[in-house]
Structure formats: C-alpha cells, structure tokens
Curated annotation (Swiss-Prot):
It is found in: Nucleus. GO terms for cellular component: nucleus. This is Probable protein phosphatase 2C 23. Keywords: Developmental protein, Hydrolase, Magnesium, Manganese, Metal-binding, Nucleus, Phosphoprotein, Protein phosphatase. It comes from Arabidopsis thaliana (Mouse-ear cress).
C-alpha cells in the first residue's frame, strides 16, 4: 500500500534552506505504508515567489505562519454503510491524505529497529518517526516552482501530479540514473495499483477512471436502482454551488482520514482566511465523511456578506433561499418530519440567541460587534448540515438502520486576520499557547510542570545552567472550546433536568449507558425515538418520552489574537487521553525551541504513542505492530493541527 516514495517536500523554509541545492532524499526504496497515518504541512508562500496578480502586502496576508498537521489511526478502515458495491473496497487503508500541491505530506514512518534502540522518554529529542515534511524541507531545501491551479480530480491523478511537479525542477547530478530508476518503479507501482480517493470527496464523486468493462456497467446499474447513490452518500444533496467551487476561489485545501477521524484544511491567501475542521466520528464513517464534504461549503455560504462579498449579481439569491428544499423527492415524505424540523430550528435559534446573549453579558465584552454574527453563521451552517444528513439517513433508514448509530464530534476553527472563531460539539479541543503573566507563571505553571513526565524533567536537570533555563516552559495553556461530555457536571445536570422521569438518562458515565459525549452531530438514536426503534433490539436504548438525550448545539467562541499568542493546537480528544492542556502546550513549546525546523504535530503524535506504549509495558515498535482495531485498546484515533503564530501580527484584507 501507499506510494513508492514519499511526497516530495514543497514546504518553503528560511534563508538557510534557500541557499542549498534542491536534493532528493529517498529514505526507503520500498513502498511506504500509508495505513498508520500522515504528517503534513503548509507554509505561507513568499510573496516574491507568487505571481504579481496574487501578491499581497503584509497587511493583506493571513495571520498564521505555518500549519503542521498529523494523524494516526487506531481503528480499522470501515466502508460506508451505504455501499452495496464499492470499487474502493480493495483499498483497506485506515489512513489516507490528499491535497492541492501547496501542501506537503508524507506517511508516518517509524524509525527502523535496525537503526538502534529507542528508549521511550529518553529526552525531548527522542525520535520514533523519520523526518516530517517541514524538517525535510529544511534538510533538502525548497523545490522551485509554485503550485498550479487546483485540479478537480483527486486520488491517483493528484499523486502523479505531485510527482511530476517535483521532478520537473529536480537536479539530481551524479545520482540521476539510480534515482530515476527508483522513481520510475515507484510511479509504476502507484499507477498499477489504480489507487483512488478514499477520503470523501469535496465534490460529488465522479466515475473512477480506472473502472472498466463489467465493473463500470455494474456501477451504472446500481446507480440507477438506488434512491441515494451508494458511492456518494456523503455528497448527496451537496451544499456546493458555483459560489463555493474550490476551483473558482483560488483555494488551497487538504483532507485526510485516520480511522474514524477526518481533517479538513482550506486556505485562502487571497482573502486572508483559514478554515480547519476536525471531525471525530464514532460507530462508523458516514457522519464524519458527510461533514468533510458538506460543512465547509455550508459555512462559506452562511458567511456571505460577513467575511466575503459576491462580486457577481445576486441573481441566484432566490435559489439560495430554497437550499433547504433542494431535494424534490423528499416532498412526498410525511409532514411530521417538517414539523419536527421547524420545532427543532426554533429551539436551536432560541438556545443560540441565549448563548450569544450570555456571552455579551459576560465580564469580557467582545470588542468585535461583528463576531456574534459570524458565530451565529457558523452555528447555522452546522444546523443545516445536520438536518440534511439526518434527512438523507431517514430516507435510507429501512435499508441502513445503522446510520442512526453513527455520529461525530465537530471542531471548526475559522481565522480571518486577527480574529479566530471557534465552534465545537463534543470533546475535541482548541488550546492556545500564550506567553504567561508573571503571577500566573509563578503559581499554576510550576504546579503543572510537576505533571510533565519525569523523563523530560530529568533531561532538564541534565542540562547546563544556561541551557536548562531556556528549556523551562514559559507558555500557559488557554482552552478556547468547551468539552461536552459526561465528565462535565453541567452537561450531566442538563440532561437529567431535561429527562426528570428517566433515572438512567446518564448511567455508567455515559448518556443512556451508550455515549460518552453529551452533544454530537448525527447519532439519531439518541435524538428521536423512531431512529432508536429502527435499530436491532441489541442496539436499542430504553428511550423514554420524545425529547432528545443529546443535541448538536455548539459552543461558540471568538478570540482576538495578540502579541502573546504563540500557537494554536486543534485536536480530537485522543490527544488528551495522555496529555493535559498544559502538557501539550509545554511539549510543543519545548519541541519548537529545540527543533524550530521540525514538525510539532508529528512530534505530539509520536510522544502520545511513546506514552501509550510505556503505559502498556511495551516499546514503541511493539505498539505499532499491534493490528489496527486491536490497537484501539491502547490509544484512540488522533488528529492534530498546530498553527504557528509566533506572536507576530499580520492583518488580512477585509
């Protein structure tokens, strides 16, 4: 599985990197295993390297400097429940990644055992994986050339495009012959496998170019017989339209999967914004796949007139007003659905208005009066996306009742200039690393340092006076999101108050003994009795009344970046199985201090695996040799995005 070689690094680095000749570093001639996870990066382009039509002044660029991302899978690959015939079925990778060429990625590659012993916790520089894409860019220097226009195709065509893009500007020298042979063999293997996108596509699925003959005929037969295409359930009724076309917006994007986690990153250097979505699915892949395909387009539409203006006329405004009624076939459905949705929307809007009012009445008044409108737009986008998902699931309930079990946590971050907008449902987190106030440092941080693993502390003690002082963490952790789980007393009390006649509303620290999170996208069996009744008896809960046990009402937060803000960690909850907020921030700070050219997200994944292995009494490689699915006993799927701010401020165009 995987590409014959790693994706050639295109992350641009500092001046030292530019002075080096481009080199190709091939670490292993064998195909890389993409099933474990991926590390990826995006570095803001140098304006001098961008065409004059796209050059923006420093005041017009995005606030962040770099994006480092990494994901590791613990669960096995699971096909969409709606797939009757799936030409992707032979692809059993639990992890995958694809992007435009402005991103660089490489599969996570454990250091070979033969390279020497790996002692968990031997110090901050201890390594379990080979270099990530950012570090490789520093070692080999940036490749010439800028990314071309976004191609509508994904999968194998894209990976081949990445190879050719890098090779066009590569100068190999005396090693040319042997390297060309390796590359030719790698590309040949990639083409032979006929790999295609195994992540839910941004646009509705097109017929794979590599499906021929009887398979193609069979696909057409199934498509004609299905009410909802089994190959593109996640794209059915897509919110995409001409306004949201990625090709027409000059956007750079990346999307990946790791087990049941999904990650989506969209960058607009032209308009100065960044979108990151992390979707932590459970009970199946359909819900996070649907979010991956639909939530960003919905957010983009809701933000029209707030963060962006349509240069075209509003001739299509009447069509946009009818987006919720886009599926004409649903008109024959019972009016009970429409009535329940109207009641739900009213409750959602009422709760949202109360939430925003409570925020405005708080001690820290929001300096941006527009922020409440932006946050409300994010919430409305999520509501419409879930309504569409549940409506599609309701249409397929007889054939695929398991859709009622599937759900996902949601973490969305939108950055526009100095403004950061957060929306979350579930227990994924956004944690900000800030320069701490002196009083705060003397008190809380010193206490938190005691919880840092003793191996790292021993490494501090082994440093000289000068070095040791520089390694002491100086940043505080500020969580921008709110956890929605049974670990939060307020959430438990809310559910019990809403279900006074049900003593088992929360039992065994789970909602109805089933779900740890108290809010989630999907999971219809905890929201309406009919979805619970559609399940096999062994999966049903004792549903009392008609009120939902969980909801999808998000927590919302606006933060104005300042000079003290250094980096932002966005992650699914798997990270915090082994890290506190303070430990995660301290780990990233320590890493970028010692290895400023490194990949902090990959480092966090690596340290998490070290801790999981140590807790289980095994070494790093032994843990990774445990098959996916069984390895879920030791750690969860984990997706991490670290956005470097470095305390610098750039203003985006408005």
């Amino acid at each position: 599985m995987g590409n014959g070689i790693g994706k050639l690094s295109k992350c641009l680095t500092g001046g030292a990197g530019r002075n080096k000749k481009p080199e190709l570093s091939i670490l292993e001639p064998d195909p890389l295993d993409e099933g474990l996870g991926h590390s990826f990066c995006y570095v803001r382009p140098d304006p001098t390297r961008v065409s004059s039509s796209k050059v923006h002044s420093e005041e017009e660029t995005t606030t962040f400097r770099t994006i480092s991302g990494a994901s590791v899978s613990a669960n096995t690959a699971t096909p969409l429940s709606t797939s009757l015939y799936d030409p992707y079925g032979h692809i059993d990778r639990a992890a995958a990644f694809e992007s435009t060429t402005s991103f660089s990625s490489i599969p996570l590659q454990p250091i070979p055992r033969s390279s020497g012993p790996i002692v968990p916790g031997s110090g901050p520089l201890e390594r379990g994986f080979l270099s990530g894409p950012i570090e490789r860019g520093f070692m080999s220097g940036p490749l010439d050339g800028s990314s071309g226009p976004i191609d509508g195709k994904t999968g194998s065509d894209q990976f081949q495009r990445s190879f050719s893009h890098g090779l066009a500007n590569l100068r190999v020298g005396s090693r040319k012959g042997s390297l060309v042979r390796v590359l030719r063999r790698a590309i040949s293997k990639t083409i032979t496998r006929g790999q295609n996108s195994i992540v839910a596509p941004i646009k509705p699925v097109k017929e794979p170019d590599w499906v021929f003959g009887s398979d193609k005929t069979r696909i057409h037969q199934i498509e004609n017989n299905l009410t909802v295409n089994s190959l593109n359930f996640s794209s059915e009724g897509s919110l995409l339209d001409d306004d949201v076309s990625l090709e027409s917006q000059n956007l750079q994007w990346a999307q990946g999967k790791a087990g049941e986690d999904r990650v989506h990153v969209v960058v607009s250097e032209e308009h100065g914004w960044l979108f990151v979505g992390i979707y932590d699915g459970f009970n199946g892949p359909d819900a996070p796949d649907y979010l991956l395909s639909h939530l960003y387009p919905a957010v983009h539409r809701e933000l029209k007139g707030l963060l962006w203006d349509d240069p075209k006329t509003d001739a299509k405004s009447s069509d946009e007003a009818d987006v919720e009624n886009r599926d004409s076939s649903s008109e024959k459905k019972s009016k009970n659905w429409e009535e329940s949705q109207r009641r739900w929307r009213c409750e959602w809007d009422r709760d949202l208005d109360r939430l925003l009012k409570d925020r405005s009445n708080g001690l820290d008044l929001d300096p941006d009066p527009n922020s409440s409108d932006v946050l409300k737009a994010l919430s409305q986008a999520l509501r419409k996306t879930e309504e569409a998902y549940l409506e599609n699931a309701d249409m397929m309930l007889d054939e695929n009742p398991e859709l009622a079990l599937m759900g996902s946590c949601v973490l969305v971050m939108l950055m526009k200039g100095e403004d950061v907008y957060l929306m979350n449902v579930g227990d994924s987190r956004a944690v900000l690393g800030q320069k701490a106030e002196s009083d705060y440092w003397i008190g809380k941080i010193k206490q938190d340092l005691e919880r840092i693993n003793e191996e790292t502390m021993n490494d501090f003690d082994g440093c000289g006076d000068g070095e040791g002082a520089s390694l002491v963490p100086t940043l505080s952790a500020f969580q921008l999101t709110v956890d929605h789980s049974t670990n939060v007393e307020e959430e438990v009390n809310r559910i019990r108050k809403e279900h006074p006649d049900d003593a088992s509303a929360v039992s065994n620290e789970r909602v109805k003994g089933s779900l740890k999170v108290t809010r989630a996208f999907g999971a219809g069996f905890l929201k309406q009795p009919k979805w619970n009744n559609a399940l096999l008896e062994m999966f049903q809960i004792d549903y009392k009344g008609t009120s939902p046990y969980i909801n999808c009402l998000p927590s919302l937060y606006h933060h104005r970046l300042g000079s003290k803000d250094q980096f932002l960690i966005l992650s699914s909850d798997g990270l915090y199985q082994y890290f506190t907020n303070e430990e995660a921030v301290s780990e990233v700070e320590l890493f970028i201090t010692l290895q400023p050219e490194g990949d902090p997200a990959q480092h966090l994944v690596q340290e998490l695996l070290f801790r999981a292995a140590k807790k289980a009494g095994m070494d790093f490689h032994e843990l990774l040799e445990i098959p996916q699915g069984e390895r879920r006993r030791y750690h969860d799927d984990v997706s991490i995005v670290v956005i470097s701010l470095e305390g610098r401020m750039w203003k985006s165009c408005v």
